[in-house]
């Protein structure tokens, strides 16, 4: 019985820790945009994967943060991408429609999607150099990214 309790506590603790992270224009978890990749690896005690193939621009992941990929440009983490709506500083959830997100955050700027004729980008700028961007299709939020400009504004990723 004790072993079962320990296993359940471990599972729920890990789940809570992972879901407790928040994506913002400043960073994700312990990672801050603008940090050197090497410094982040030392801070987290783990290496990014895969090893950066192109020093100019690569996408990497950390085991600690399985829901997010990080853009590294010239050794600096500039952006994070999530293939779903994760907990974020805007308080926007996956259950919200585009219209609900706009009501929740009136400062969201809505623009057309580059590839999806039924899609939109919803951008919440933070100052002149950072942003949180949501992608939507047919009125439903699909994925998101955050980071430093201009990297966060790139439609495509790298690597």
Regions found by a protein language model. Give the residues of each.
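A cross-family detector of function-defining hotspots
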Residues: 20-21, 35-76, 94-141, 146-151
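Second-shell loop/turn segments in exported
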Residues: 25-30, 85-92
């Amino acid at each position: 019985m004790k072993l079962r309790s320990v296993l359940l506590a471990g599972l729920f603790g890990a789940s809570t820790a992972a879901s407790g992270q928040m994506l913002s224009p400043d960073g994700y978890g312990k990672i801050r945009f603008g940090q050197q990749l090497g410094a982040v690896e030392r801070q987290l005690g783990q290496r990014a994967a895969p090893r950066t193939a192109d020093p100019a621009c690569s996408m990497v992941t950390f085991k600690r943060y399985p829901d997010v990929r990080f853009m590294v440009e010239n050794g600096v983490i500039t952006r994070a991408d999530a293939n779903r709506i994760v907990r974020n500083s805007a308080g926007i959830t996956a259950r919200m429609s585009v219209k609900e997100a706009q009501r929740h955050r009136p400062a969201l700027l809505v623009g057309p999607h580059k590839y999806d004729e039924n899609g939109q980008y919803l951008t919440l700028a933070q100052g002149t150099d950072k942003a949180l961007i949501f992608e939507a299709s047919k009125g439903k939020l699909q994925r998101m990214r955050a980071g430093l400009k201009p990297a966060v504004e790139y439609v495509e990723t790298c690597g």
